[in-house]
Every structure is written in structure tokens, then in C-alpha cells.
Amino acid sequence: MPDTKLPEELEALKLTIRNIVENECIPLESEYLSNPPQENDDTGPKGIAETVLGIVGTLPQEKWDHLEQISKDTGIYTLFVPEKYGGGGMGALGHVVMDEEIHRSIVQIPTSPVPMMMIDSCTPDQEEQYLIPSIDGKLNYAFCQTEPQAGSDPGGMMQTKAVRDGDDWVLTGTKMYISGAASADFLLVQAVTDDTKRQRGGITMFIVDNPSEGLSFEPIRIWITPTKSQQFYVNLDEVRVPQTKV
């Protein structure tokens, strides 16, 4: 029979995360659940967390900071960031091990909000301005692909367009169900640049700073929770993006 035991280093990782979850995260669950976001809170500040279970609650900022520091001290924070950026370079099996343990609590250990789609595809200037600060937790981003008419087939049905105008691109369209969009420092927006090629080379990703002229957000309520979620419509009304942010 094949050996199904985890490698020794992953067993150690599993134990480390389990101890943090049991001793730091689970004891905060009651406080988290008893403090839903305020009704007029549309931006999703750092003190609000949304879990995959659709349960939304809040904790004081200092408690999130405490969990984040534990995550950084143990190396969990950048566990899957490539080694060349100072991370652990952990693979898929390690990801599974971590997810299994982290999701034992609805209060989850913070990890680096690294935009993986930028790794090995951004320019040196973009790396310095956006990627590395994101890895360090200094910037947050939101990935904008899904649209009202383009969910399961974004390549074929995407309506957001980007038109070249001199040294800029002009983006027009609407994205939907975008997590954390309003509070993000920048957005990674997919838009059609060649309607004939589309997913075969005609869809481009743009870095859109938040705020930008013509960029706006509308919060979306999710039926599984009575509180306001961190899901948003992202409206792009002739938002100009320089070629340097493609």
C-alpha cells in the first residue's frame, strides 16, 4: 500500500497551525459573532472579516493585529509566497494542510494578501509599487473578473472593455461579487481589449488604483447573512489607466 503519511515538515506545520487555532482563534469566536458590522458600513475595514461560511462578524483591530503578528512570527503569513520574495514557497499539499486547520475556526489566521497572478508577470516597477507591498501586508487588492452576465464563462461573455487612447487605456464596464473591492488599495481588472481574440489573447489585466476618477462601488447583500457583506459591484465609467499599469 502507498504511504499516505504526511512528510515530517507538514506534520509539524499542521501541529503549529492547530495550536494557534485552538489557543488563539477559537476563543475569539463568541466575541466575533456577537459583533456584526454596522448597517452603514460599506467599505469593509480591516476589522471586518468574511468567512467562506458566509458568517460575518467583527473584532477589535488590536486582536486582528495580534493574530497577524503570530502568523508572521511563525512564517504562516507568507507560507505560499515564492522564496525569492522572502516566503516559504510551500506547494499544493501544504496549502491543503493549512486550509484544513485554519478552517476549524470561523476566526481565521491572517495570511499575506499576495496577488499571485502578478508573480512572474508584472514589471519591475509594478513589483516594487504593488506586489512587494501586498506581500508585506501594506496594500490590499481586489481581483475583478466576474460580471453580471459573465460568471461561468468570463472569456466568452465579458462585457468590460478597454480602449487605447494615447498612452492610456479607458475602461468601461461593471464587475460583480468582488470581495473587499471598496477597501482595496488597488484593483486587478480584466477587460476585453480585442473582441475577436478574447480569451485567446484579447483579454488584458489592468492595475486600477483606488480611488480613481470614474471608479465607484455598490455593496451587495448576500442572502445567507442578514448583515452587509464585503461583496461589491465595481463600476468603471471611463476609468483611465496608463500603459505602465497593464
Name every feature range the model reports, one short phrase each.
Residues 168, 172-220:
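A short core secondary-structure module
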Residues 151, 176-181, 225-226:
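Glycine-rich phosphate/pyrophosphate-binding beta-alpha loops
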Residues 1-110, 129, 133:
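Amphipathic, small/basic residue-rich leader segments at the start of a protein or domain
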Residues 157, 213-242, 246:
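Flexible, small-/acidic-enriched active-site or ligand-binding loops
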Residues 89-101, 154-157, 235, 241:
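Structural signature of FAD isoalloxazine-binding scaffolds in flavoprotein oxidoreductases
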Residues 108-129, 152-154:
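N-terminal glycine-rich flavin-associated loop
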Residues 137-146, 190:
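A short, Trp-centered hydrophobic/proline-enriched beta-strand micro-motif
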Residues 160-163:
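A structural signal for short hydrophobic beta-strand segments in well-ordered beta-sheet cores
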